[in-house]
Swiss-Prot record:
Organism listed in the record: Mus musculus
Domain annotation Ubiquitin-like: ranges: 10-72
Protein name: Homocysteine-responsive endoplasmic reticulum-resident ubiquitin-like domain member 1 protein
Cytoplasmic side: 1-263, 311-391
Region called Disordered, residue ranges: 90-126, 317-361
GO molecular function: transmembrane transporter binding; ubiquitin-like ligase-substrate adaptor activity
Function: Component of the endoplasmic reticulum quality control (ERQC) system also called ER-associated degradation (ERAD) involved in ubiquitin-dependent degradation of misfolded endoplasmic reticulum proteins. Binds to ubiquilins and this interaction is required for efficient degradation of CD3D via the ERAD pathway.
Main subcellular localisation: endoplasmic reticulum
Length: 391
């Protein structure tokens, strides 16, 4: 006869997915089959599930009844975790009694509703009275479904004891909804401009003084256009900056000194670029060309700084805006008292902005053109830093 195999004890930890019961730890043998393990669980598990209703899962795999534990469980581990999934057809006694009590309470409520149809409108009042008259122990038990079922089983047939939310949560939801609706109402009222704040108890009455009567013809009509134009110019352009220039990329730029807005990184970049230019010019050119380019560069830099202003830029005489002055001298009644318009008197006279310019300004000389070409060529060789943006 073959000797019987020695039992190999193994520890199994059975877990329930729905967490209705605590984890069950039991001792078994590796020689057991899955069907024998299910039979053992039907005796020791709290709900006594039948073997046909049990499903055992290990490492994500469903265990079949004919399989053996020694073929499924590794030998290196002494403790293994199994998940038990079962369909309990006989629930505990407590839910049965609670459902029976709920059904028994619903029947008289239905009869009362048919006899007294006016009672349905007072269900909300009865709910509030029950919530208001709850004892501290009742508030503590409100988190348990059994206590909620026993407390609110007489409220009416339309309220079930097995609701998704508890009664306390439903009351909170109602308060949150009312508060949100009230805040939306206040926001809409404030946006429309019809919101009137409630007067406070410490409000002091103030007697408003009547405004003085306006003086008739206080401001003459002949001074009104000039004063209005001057005020409009002061408002539109208060303290205009003379160094302001327009930027094609958007926004104004201010003509400021480059040395103020340049940091050490800009100076390092300029020095590196200039050193590379000098090295290329020195190694790939002769000494005479190098000195000539250096001299021209120094002269260009001094001219750019302002030491050698070769040609002064002519001052542009902008035509004077005679609008306010003409408006001040104009008769408010538009009477022809000041004579006719000069343009009407002399039709051959050209306006000031269309006068013929000086021939010296219209046709540039040959020297100015040559100097402009020379300046543009050498200015393109010099590195130019980024423009300073206005804050």
């Amino acid at each position: 006869m073959e000797p019987e195999p020695q039992p190999e004890p193994v520890t199994l930890l059975v877990k329930s997915p729905n967490q209705r019961h605590r984890d069950l730890e039991l001792s078994g043998d590796r020689s057991w089959s899955v069907s024998r393990l299910k039979a053992h669980l039907s005796r020791v598990y709290p709900e006594r599930p039948r073997p046909e209703d049990q499903r055992l899962i290990y490492s994500g795999k469903l265990l079949l009844d004919h399989q053996c534990l020694q073929d499924l469980l590794p030998k290196q581990e002494k403790r293994h975790v199994l998940h038990l999934v079962c369909n309990v057809k006989n629930p505990s006694k407590m839910p049965e009694t609670s459902t029976k009590g709920a059904e028994s309470t619903e029947q008289p409520d239905n009869s009362n509703q048919t006899q007294h149809p006016g009672d349905s409108s007072s269900d909300g009042l009865r709910q509030r009275e029950v919530l208001r008259n709850l004892s501290p122990s009742g508030w503590e038990n409100i988190s348990r479904p059994e206590a909620v079922q026993q407390t609110f089983q007489g409220l009416g047939p339309g309220f079930s004891g097995y609701t998704t939310y508890g009664w306390l949560q439903l009351s909170w939801f109602q308060q949150i909804y009312a508060r949100q609706y009230y805040m939306q109402y206040l926001a809409a009222t404030a946006a429309s401009g019809t919101f009137v704040p409630t007067p406070s108890a410490q409000e002091i009455p103030v007697v408003s003084t009547p405004a003085p009567a306006p003086i008739h013809n206080q401001f003459p009509a002949e001074n009104q256009p000039a004063n209005q134009n001057a005020a409009a110019q002061a408002v539109v352009n208060p303290g205009a900056n003379q160094n302001l220039r327009m930027n094609a990329q958007g926004g104004p730029l201010v003509e400021e000194d480059d040395e103020i807005n340049r940091d050490w990184l800009d100076w390092t970049y300029s020095a590196a670029t200039f050193s590379v230019f000098l090295s290329i010019l020195y190694f790939y050119s002769s000494l005479s060309r190098f000195l000539m380019v250096m001299g021209a560069t120094v002269v260009m830099y001094l001219h750019h700084v302002g030491w050698f202003p070769f040609r002064q830029r002519p001052v542009q005489n902008f035509p004077d805006d005679g609008g306010p002055r003409d408006a001040a001298n104009q008769d408010p009644n538009n009477n022809l008292q000041g004579g006719m318009d000069p343009e009407m008197e002399d039709p051959n006279r050209l306006p000031p902005d269309r006068e013929v310019l000086d021939p010296e300004h219209t046709s540039p000389s040959f020297m100015s053109t040559a100097w402009l070409v020379f300046k543009t060529f050498f200015a393109s060789l010099l590195p130019e830093g980024p423009p300073a943006l206005a804050n």
